[in-house]
Design a protein with these regions (language model features):
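Short beta-strand segments in beta-sandwich/barrel cores
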Residues: 111, 120-121, 137-143, 288
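N-terminal secretory signal peptides and thylakoid transit peptides that target proteins
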Residues: 1-17
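A short, N-terminal "cap"/entry segment at the start of jelly-roll beta-barrel domains
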Residues: 31-107, 210-292
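Ligand-binding loop in jelly-roll beta-barrel domains
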Residues: 165-192
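Histidine-centered metal-chelating micro-motifs
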Residues: 119-122, 140, 160-161, 165-170
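Short acidic-glycine-tyrosine-enriched beta hairpin
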Residues: 146-162
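Glycine- and acidic-residue-biased ligand/ion/polar-headgroup-sensing regions
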Residues: 127-146
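Mobile, glycine-rich extracellular loop/lid and propeptide segments
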Residues: 122, 131-133, 158
Length: 293
């Protein structure tokens, strides 16, 4: 890019940023003055007569008053967790946005989940990979691969994990207020309510088969749940070292990554941390960037 082109680009970008900021500030001021935004841009548009939802319209100004550069049919590029059904369970909840709610999200599915201290998202597995980001609190993640390698780790706000598809795993909130986190699956049509759960699996296997497999009497399975638990309350676990299971040894690649310990790329406008399979080998299907502006 020549100096002239670069100068023009920077000047245009600055003007665009200033105009965008002015629009947002004006909208906030209008809402604060009990003057809801209207679908008017210069000589185009007209005031809303009815129906109207000023609060929602103020949150979606670029949909109500789209930029003049928009052209043709514009798909919805965002969807709020506040608008989806929430699954309430003893010890927590879960809500998801999939390709059903957000049509452009055919490659990714997102779940927002909350676990109280001690509460467990029971051991389960599914076809797509699971990439997780801790929003608040602390949690313990546990998994075992097909070779019997066991994995346990305690992670906190800003940390991430990735379980490859088919790997059985569980999640548990730790002391304090438990945890809240975001899950991402590399399948937009994946359904969090349709995972394979260990309680559901055990409930549909004859007890004599379970007894022979685990080498215990059938009576050991007399009180197993008759249906899935999904999320259930439990006690806060003890220290991580005391909870570790040796199994066949550690997994080949760790399933957790301390993202906030990663040195960020610093710029004049903020910083960014990028995580992909080059610095987190377990995350072969999903890459991400944490951007601070």
């Amino acid at each position: 890019m020549s100096n002239f082109q670069r100068r023009d680009f920077l000047t245009g970008a600055a003007a665009f940023a200033a105009a965008t900021t002015a629009t947002l500030v004006g909208t906030r001021r209008a809402v604060a003055d009990d003057k809801p935004p209207q679908p008017i841009r210069g000589k185009e548009g007209a005031p809303i007569i009815d129906p109207t939802n000023p609060t929602r319209e103020a949150q979606n100004v670029d949909r109500l008053v789209p930029p003049s550069t928009d052209h043709g049919t514009m798909p919805n590029l965002r969807f709020s967790f506040a608008d989806v059904h929430n699954r309430l369970q003893p010890g927590g909840w879960a809500r998801q946005v999939t390709g059903r709610e957000l049509q452009v999200a055919q490659a990714l599915n997102c779940v927002n989940m909350r676990l109280k201290a001690g509460a467990v998202r029971e051991m389960h597995w599914h076809v797509p990979d699971e990439w997780g980001f801790v929003l608040k609190g602390r949690m313990r993640i546990t998994a075992v691969d097909g070779e019997g390698h066991a994995f346990q780790d305690d992670i906190s706000e800003g940390n991430i994990w990735n379980f490859p598809g088919g790997i059985p795993h569980s999640l548990q909130g730790l002391e304090g207020d438990g945890c809240e986190f975001l899950l991402v699956f590399n399948d937009g049509n994946f359904n969090e309510d349709a995972t394979f759960l260990v309680t559901d699996f055990l409930a549909h296997i004859p007890k004599e088969v379970l007894a022979k497999n685990f080498g215990v009497p059938e009576s050991a399975f007399a009180n197993i749940p008759k249906e899935e638990l999904y999320i259930f309350e439990s006690q806060v676990p003890g220290p991580l070292d005391a909870d570790r299971v040796v199994g066949a040894g550690p997994v080949p690649s760790t399933y957790s990554h301390k993202l906030m310990d990663q040195k960020p790329i610093e710029t004049n406008g903020g910083r960014v941390r990028i995580v992909d399979s080059s610095n987190f080998p377990a995350a072969k299907m999903i890459a991400a960037a944490l951007v601070e502006v």
